Regions:
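Active-site loop/helix belt of alpha/beta enzymes
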Residues: 3-19, 26-142, 149-150
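Structural motif
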Residues: 19-21, 54-55, 94-96, 113-114, ...
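Fold-independent oxyanion-binding glycine-rich loops
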Residues: 1, 24-25, 59-60, 99-102, ...
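C-terminal accessory subdomain/extension
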Residues: 148-230
């Protein structure tokens, strides 16, 4: 239905050869065309020139766990069969890709024309193997203000951040509206200031959170790493 709606709208606007990426459901059972859909999909792609498949892809359900290797190989075989149907219905070459982060590591012979590195971009190995992955992204901010507070004073909403000693508390301009998970507040999470961990104190606010820099040599304007190499 979605493909039909896309073709209809593209035809209505006079669009030709609009590039699309065809998702195959090879066993994840989330989204995509099934093997049973291939005859109808093939005919639909051949019957028009409004959209053109640029790639065909699928997604593993358990490539990070060796106990699912037989199922993962079934997914690969089914995907390849479906990919042939899509390729035969399209006049130009169609890229194939099924490998996610753990698939890249564990099924190296199935790289085809492209791979999709997901959680690996953050330096995390989904399959637990020592792959020497390194993060390629860093999020930094700066210290807005530092306050000297006394023992038993509180920081933030609901007075959740109760200080157990005289402390230096820094405010940094990032909060849950920026995607910083509120569950990381109340010392459950930390950031890095000048190479040292600074716990998040109290509840994380919408645009600001507070960190404990009592034992860190820092000043207002210093860089704070939210995530990255450190």
């Amino acid at each position: 239905k979605l493909l039909d709606a896309l073709i209809y709208e593209a035809e209505r606007q006079g669009i030709m050869r609009y590039p699309i990426h065809v998702k195959i459901d090879s066993g994840m059972h989330r989204l995509g065309f099934t093997l049973e859909d291939m005859p109808r999909l093939s005919e639909r792609l051949k019957s028009q020139t409004t959209v053109m498949a640029r790639s065909v892809f699928s997604h593993f359900a358990g490539s990070d766990e060796p106990r699912f290797d037989a199922f993962s190989r079934q997914q690969i075989a089914l995907f390849k069969e479906c990919a042939v149907a899509v390729q035969s219905a399209t006049p130009q070459p169609v890229m194939r890709h099924i490998l996610n982060t753990s698939g890249i590591t564990r099924f190296t012979e199935e790289q085809m024309e492209a791979v999709r590195l997901g959680i690996g971009l953050y330096g995390i190995s989904a399959c637990g193997m020592d792959t020497d992955l390194r993060t390629v992204s860093t999020l930094k901010t700066t210290i807005l203000q530092i306050k000297e507070l006394e023992e038993d004073q509180t920081v933030g909403y609901s007075r959740r951040g109760v200080l157990t000693r005289r402390s230096r508390i820094a405010a940094i301009p990032i909060g849950y509206a920026d995607g910083l998970n509120r569950h990381l507040g109340n010392r459950k999470g930390a950031v890095v200031v000048n190479g040292k961990r600074a716990p998040i104190v109290g509840n994380i606010c919408m645009d600001v959170c507070m960190i404990d820099v009592t034992d860190i040599d820092c000043k207002e304007g210093d860089r704070v790493e939210i995530f990255g190499e450190q």
